[in-house]
Amino acid sequence: MPSRRAVLAGTPLLAMPRLARAQDAFPTRPVTIVVPFPPGGGTDVLARILAQHFAEAWRLPVIVENRGGGAGRIGMQQVQRAQPDGHTLMVTSTGGMMGLAGIERAFSVREHLTPITLVAAPAYVVAMHPGVGARNVAELITLARARPGHFTFGSSGIGAASHLAAELFASMAGIEMLHVPYRGTGPALGDLIAGRIHLMFAPPQTVAAAVAGGQVVNLAVTSEHATPLLPGLRTVAETGLPGYSAVGWFALFAPRNVPSAIIERIATDAARALNLPETRARLAALGAEPEPMRPDAFAAYVDADIAKWQRVVRDRNITLE
């Protein structure tokens, strides 16, 4: 694959002013960021953070439009049908993209959308009811192997990134746990605190108050490396399941065929916004760190990540809603 520098070097000189004009002319009217989920979730919050900074940078209104339904497909279809001029964008998540990708076929994000940048790739924590009694991941696996099907874990819904992270854990550990899907993380956390389920793979901020109150124990973090946002908490891989890593992601997309100069402009402005101290602080409150990525690298990242979760869905016989 030729490098980006080589591609630019081979671009006809007559085309360069056209690319520059496309970038300079953007935006020419208000921009809409579609969120394919209801208001209030992490995707919505991140979209509004970007919208605020884009509006300041572009000196035009940037509107966040929530189009929930169909596991994210309704909002995505709206973006796919939009004019390819950069004035309609989308912030979505791992679970939303899985709804578009399906499970049986090879997936390339560029066949459906134009990837712009990764926004954040937050890890989860293995949140456990204290009554389970495990002190680390290795002990949890030992307990689960001794009692196949006894342990239950909750999630915010079938096919959610937290659900798939737990299924990957069970598969790699060689254990069987019962999945209990909920309509959102709040009800799942309530049952975890009450002891009606044993585990959750949850966003850290979701369980923070329960952990502080001793009602829930954070056993490990699911990322490949420990995060400074959770000081002292070791990873699943370090504490009993080598090779395990699972993170969700939030990212920015546009319709197919948006001119590359406009995509580069948006990606650059997004990276600038994400690296501001105030943005980093707001993301930290969500348990995430900014992860801006160039469009080509991000497209490869999404395709590889979706392929990973497709394998989990097939191997675990999960029927996506």
Residues covered by each model-derived region:
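Hinge/capping helix and adjacent helix->loop/strand transition within the periplasmic-binding protein
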Residues: 81-87, 101-187, 236, 249-282
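An extracytoplasmic/periplasmic, membrane-proximal ligand-sensing/linker region
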Residues: 28-30, 172-175, 260-321
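Immediate post-signal peptide segment of exported/extracytoplasmic ligand-binding proteins
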Residues: 20-33, 83-88, 141-151, 212-213, ...
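C-terminal lobe and pocket-closing loops
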Residues: 121, 207-275, 307
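N-terminal secretory signal peptides and thylakoid transit peptides that target proteins
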Residues: 1-12
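Beta->alpha turn/N-cap motifs
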Residues: 91-96, 100, 155, 185, ...
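N-terminal (or domain-start) structured segment
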Residues: 22-111, 150, 175-198, 292, ...
